[in-house]
Amino acid sequence: QRELLMEVTGLHEIPEGAYNIRANGESVERNSTSNIEIITKEDKSGIEIHIKPGTKRESVHIPVVLSKSGLKEVVYNDFYIGDNADVTIVAGCGIHNGGDAASRHDGIHRFYVGKNAHIKYVEKHYGSGEGKGERIMNPVTEIHLDEDSFMEMDTAQIKGVDSTKRENRAYLKDGAKLVVMERLMTHGSQRAESYFDVQMDGEDSSANIVSRSVAREDSYQLFDSHIHGNNRCSGHTECDAIIMDNAKISATPELSANHVDAALIHEAAIGKIAGEQILKLRTLGLTEE
């Protein structure tokens, strides 16, 4: 479990600040601070994280690890981030499956980001184990950005996840800004599907969704991005994928301009590896070799 924890958070020990560590279906360690309170949901599995207005330079770690084969869970985590807060949230899930039964974690994360708040959200998914049982993760991220708030989402899946369906929805008010960087690598017969649906409802809102991926061997990837400009706004979505071996990749970016001052751009590039693409691979955490 400690190895999984290190892979998804980069931590070798219990973090400072607020944290909730979930292992094999239950919360095993938790700490709240004077500004960040973590409480257990009463009606379903999961937690609520309440961050006081004006909280600065604090972090929340909420990793999940599964090391028992055959475990399946759905967890609901809701984040309430007060006005003018500036915090980092580190999530992620690691599954070690040494058995024959599938292990599955579906994490449903909802963010309610207050006015002028600044959030960095880091999410990493990792799988290991030599068993025949599948390692399945289906994260859902729902983001509500209030006026002039900013959220940066950095999500990565580098290894060992057999099947994933990643759903992301965002709703932006006036002046809100969303930046997403997705990094993905699949191999073997893995399947990865990523869905983004962004509603830019507010005046001068903006969204930038970038996916960098590598598909190897017999794996399959789908990138499906919908950006809706419902006001004066700017939106950009980009899929940049490297295909190798017998892999398959589909990219379906879609733009909907519903306002005369909506400025929307999409870019999609899929191709085999070339010299300049080594740099892209290195952004996935791989070495040049």
Give names to the regions the model predicted.
Residues 1-20:
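C-terminal functional modules
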